[in-house]
UniProtKB/Swiss-Prot annotation:
PANTHER family linked to this entry: BIOTIN SYNTHASE (PTHR22976), BIOTIN SYNTHASE, MITOCHONDRIAL (PTHR22976:SF2)
SUPFAM superfamilies reported for this sequence: Radical SAM enzymes (SSF102114)
Function (record text): Catalyzes the conversion of dethiobiotin (DTB) to biotin by the insertion of a sulfur atom into dethiobiotin via a radical-based mechanism.
Name this polypeptide is given: Biotin synthase
Pfam families per record: BATS (PF06968), Radical_SAM (PF04055)
Species the sequence originates in: Corynebacterium efficiens (strain DSM 44549 / YS-314 / AJ 12310 / JCM 11189 / NBRC 100395)
Recorded name of the encoding gene: bioB
Cofactor comment text: Binds 1 [4Fe-4S] cluster. The cluster is coordinated with 3 cysteines and an exchangeable S-adenosyl-L-methionine.
Amino acid sequence: MPNTTSILDTARHQVLGDGIGLDQSQLIEILNLPDEDIPALMELAHQVRLKWCGEEIEVEGIISLKTGGCPEDCHFCSQSGLFESPVRSVWLDIEQLVEAAKQTAKSGATEFCIVAAVKGPDDKLMNQLEEAVAAIQREVDIEVAASVGSLTPEQVTRLARAGVHRYNHNLETARSFFPQVVTTHTWEERRETLRLVAEAGMEVCSGGILGMGETLEQRAEFAVQLAELNPTEVPINFLDPRPGTPFADRPLMESEDALRAIGAFRLAMPHTMIRFAGGRELTLGAEGSEQGLLGGINAIIVGNYLTTLGRPMEDDLEMMDRLQLPLKVLNKVI
């Protein structure tokens, strides 16, 4: 068992005081904290977030431009065409994307992310994405992000020129655990796309899914590997086992473990936006979600996710209002 006072005191001086994230061995200590120390961890993580990121919460909506039929075998994902999943391939048109962006903006969101279930975009998808970004920017006061898989240098340039300001490509899990989650591509391929995105001047968004069977050591490894990306945003998902996938029978992550992970990720990345994403409703519930927002989280996806239901948007907005958490206002470009 870790020396609780020692590791939290170290984090208080190193992270809160100096803005330097914890290393892997220190994060392992955080992830092994006893349950009774979770409130102290959450309070410290909240202080770190307020000092280094500010008090605002960024709200985002996401939509799937192309759902299902993906050729990859990510074991957690019901959009893979390789598994006996109920999800079937569906494409949205430009008008539907614009309308979804308008509805997202009405919630107070400043970010709208267009997602496609593909290994990487072909010319048809790239053209449609460019058209969608242009249409949304004409009609909606919102930033547009994208997540359409692995990219070539030419595709990265096209998206940056189209006005995509942030690109999501999740590392998903620790490098050492990745082969147990995906076999049709490598962790290094994902990392290379993120390098290209950063070089093109787009903001890097990369996170993953916790509770897939990784060890605490691998969870700490993952946090450090994400920190090395210097990402603008890290979305944290918790496994929501999907019928028909290889991980369908995996148990849900314990809520206490999820809170420890949130605290650890904040202490690893004091300057990074850390976003609540899929699975929080099942893993944490309403009370745990509130603890997370007061324990290091400073961004949230509202509404539904790609293939799973989220909480009603109004419930999340009411929760943030009750907790007196101000929403980020979209910065105007003049």
